[in-house]
Each structure stands twice: as structure tokens, then as C-alpha cells.
Amino acid sequence: DKASKSRRMALWGSLQVKFGLSYIAVIAAVLLLLNTYPLLVSEDLVFRSKETNMTGSVSVVVYSLAGLNRLNQENVAAAMAVVEETGLSRVLVTDSAGLVLYDTRETGSAVGKYTFYSEIVQALEGYDAFSCSYRDGAFRSRTASPVLYQNRIIGAVYAYKYDTEQAALLEGLQSNLLKLSAGIAAAVV
């Protein structure tokens, strides 16, 4: 019993086992890095791209409303009629109190109701706001900007985009990296 215990201790203390375990640890660390870093960088690039695109789309709407001294359903609808469709899932325009004056959603429209999405609240406080999240196979991006008339906030424009296309590309990248990692792990072991 003592002899088998000392053989096990000698086995774990041998230089070959230490090198082997070190090799496995290095390969595991490289595979972990390979599976996380490119995905994080890609996700960050998608977030930045979405912010740039959506902020630009909202700026076009804000610019079309900027000449109005106050916002109401009629003049907002007239101004929005000339704004080109920007590929957004939803656009809301509110007055300075958060009352929705315009909503592109056809069913369940929020026109005539108050909305307090955090991005709209920030816009009504004078800030541009953007948020983006990735879950359940889709990017959900939201942005809002204040509408100003003579340096006075008269409302806000909010845009929402639900995007599964870029999410599918990111999931495809993740799948390819996992397959590549499995192949490398199989070749190494």
C-alpha cells in the first residue's frame, strides 16, 4: 500500500506529467481566448454600427421636426410623411411631456398615451440616448434624441430596431469557432 502510494506520488511529480498538464492548460487557455475574444470584438462592432446607423436615422427625423414651434399629432404626421422609411422597426415622436404623437406601429399604437422608456426620458432631459442588447437570437437597439425649437425641448424622437440578421451572423461565427476549437482540441489530444 505504501509502495503504490509512493509510485502515484512519483507519477504526479514526474516532469513528463507536469509538462503534459502545462501543455493542456495552455491549449485550454488558447481555445478559451479563441472562443471569446473574436465574439466580444464582433459584438462591440455591431453595437457601434447600430448606434451610428440608428442615430443617423433619428437625426433625419429630428431635423424634419426642428422647424415646428410645437408638436401635435397633425404637424408631426405631416412632417413624417416626407421622411423616408429608414428600416427601423418602430419610430415614436412625443411632445415635451412624453405624450406619444406619432407611432409607426399599426397594431397597438401608443398614440395618445404617455411613454416613459428610459431613452425617451433622457431625450426629454436634453440628452441623446442609445442602448443595444443581444438576447434570444436578436439585437434590440433603441435610440432617442430631443427635438429642439429655439433651444427649448419640445419633444423627443425614439427609434427601435429588432435585428435577427446580424444576430444570425454572430451566432454563425460562434458556431464556426466552436467547431474549429473542437477540431484543434481533437488534433492536440
Predicted feature residues:
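Juxtamembrane segments flanking the first transmembrane helix
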Residues: S6-L99, R105-G108, E125, A168, ...
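Extracytoplasmic/periplasmic sensor domains and loops in membrane signaling proteins
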Residues: V76-A77, R105-A138
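Helix-start (N-cap) segments at beta->loop->alpha junctions
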Residues: L148-Q150, Y158-L178
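Short glycine-/small-residue motifs
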Residues: D103, A156
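A short beta-strand signature within small-molecule sensing/ligand-binding domains used
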Residues: D136-L148, G155
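Selective recognition of signaling/oligomerization transmembrane alpha-helices
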Residues: Q174-V189
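Short hydrophobic/aromatic beta-strand element in the GNAT-like acyltransferase core
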Residues: R90, F130, R140, A144
